[in-house]
A protein has these predicted regions:
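Short coil-to-beta transition motif at edge beta-strands of beta-rich domains
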Residues: 4-17
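A short, polar/charged loop/turn motif at coil->beta-strand junctions and beta-hairpin connectors
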Residues: 7-9, 33, 70-72
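Short beta-strand or tight-loop elements
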Residues: 9-11, 21-23, 74
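Compositionally biased, intrinsically disordered low-complexity regions
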Residues: 12, 24-27, 50, 91, ...
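Compact nucleic-acid interaction/catalytic patches
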Residues: 16-17, 21-64
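C-terminal terminal-subdomain/extension
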Residues: 58-121
Length: 121
């Protein structure tokens, strides 16, 4: 998966999590110098396929609106995914959270410490 050089907070990117296609992730926090990024994941991949792991609804908070037609259902993990730049692939253009869901996204972002969480090597 191609690595992206300029990652922006508030945009969707494809996250490589071991699956063949990856999953859309919304960046809520970043530290370019430390190469650390925190993302909120959605349930389906770019093609709209729901991952098997996401069928387990524990520890998930549903959003009220899908991000776009191809995404069947979106959610916010209570502990968003922390990753390095190499784990972030192609930017997904045209994906946006519904305005009514922004409060949930901001709530997740506010739970992140100012210096960001620790990242295992």
């Amino acid at each position: 998966m191609a690595e992206i050089k300029n990652i922006e907070v508030g945009k969707f990117y494809l996250i490589h999590d071991g699956s063949k296609t990856g999953h859309p992730g919304f960046v809520v926090w970043k530290d370019d110098n430390a190469n650390r990024y925190l993302l909120v994941l959605t349930e389906s991949d770019k093609e709209g396929n729901v991952s098997k792991r996401s069928a387990d609804k524990r520890h998930l908070t549903d959003l009220d609106y899908p991000t776009e037609d191809r995404i069947v259902k979106s959610y916010i993990k209570k502990r968003p995914m922390l990753c390095k730049r190499k784990d972030i692939g192609i930017c997904l253009l045209g994906m946006k959270f519904h305005p009514n869901d922004y409060e949930k996204v901001k709530f997740v972002a506010k739970q992140i410490p100012v210096n960001g969480p620790s990242l295992r090597k």
